[in-house]
């Protein structure tokens, strides 16, 4: 469950390290974002000499949440942190690598490029 003011780790090599969620996109009246939802966020911490700077407004996709995700098979999965991958207007990741595992739900939401870059899909 990602809502406004939630801090997230960045799971790619775009140059940002921490994001703060400003708005969850595409959820209508619902306040919370789940895995695979797009968010608008501000960069709170970034590496020096990288294209993404601190206080930039970016669009990202949630790839991991601490809140358990219940699947149709009855299994639930949760991660150790809240993390997102920064994307461009086309929905492709801005970085060239993805760090850490990502959830299988991203494949269902047609983020196949992020899934293919991830080292592990749970």
Swiss-Prot record:
One of its GO terms (biological process) is translation. SMART domains: Ribosomal_L14. One of its GO terms (cellular component) is cytosolic large ribosomal subunit. SUPFAM superfamilies: Ribosomal protein L14. Pfam families: Ribosomal_L14. The keyword rRNA-binding applies. GO terms for molecular function: large ribosomal subunit rRNA binding; structural constituent of ribosome. PROSITE patterns: RIBOSOMAL_L14. Gene3D superfamilies: Ribosomal protein L14 (2.40.150.20). InterPro entries: Ribosomal_uL14, Ribosomal_uL14_bac-type, Ribosomal_uL14_CS, Ribosomal_uL14_sf. The keyword RNA-binding applies. Keywords: Ribonucleoprotein, Ribosomal protein, RNA-binding, rRNA-binding. Part of the 50S ribosomal subunit. Forms a cluster with proteins L3 and L19. In the 70S ribosome, L14 and L19 interact and together make contacts with the 16S rRNA in bridges B5 and B8. Belongs to the universal ribosomal protein uL14 family. Binds to 23S rRNA. Forms part of two intersubunit bridges in the 70S ribosome. This is Large ribosomal subunit protein uL14.
């Amino acid at each position: 469950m990602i809502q406004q003011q939630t801090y997230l780790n960045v799971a790619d090599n775009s140059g940002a390290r921490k994001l703060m969620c400003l708005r969850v996109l595409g959820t209508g009246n619902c306040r919370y974002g789940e895995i695979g939802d797009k968010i608008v966020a501000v960069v709170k911490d970034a590496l020096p000499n990288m294209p993404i700077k601190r206080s930039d407004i970016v669009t990202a996709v949630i790839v991991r949440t601490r809140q358990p995700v219940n699947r149709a098979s009855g299994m639930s999965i949760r991660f150790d942190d809240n993390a997102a991958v920064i994307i461009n207007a086309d929905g492709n990741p801005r970085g060239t690598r993805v760090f850490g595992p990502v959830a299988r739900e991203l494949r269902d939401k047609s983020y196949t490029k992020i899934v293919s870059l991830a080292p592990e899909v749970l």
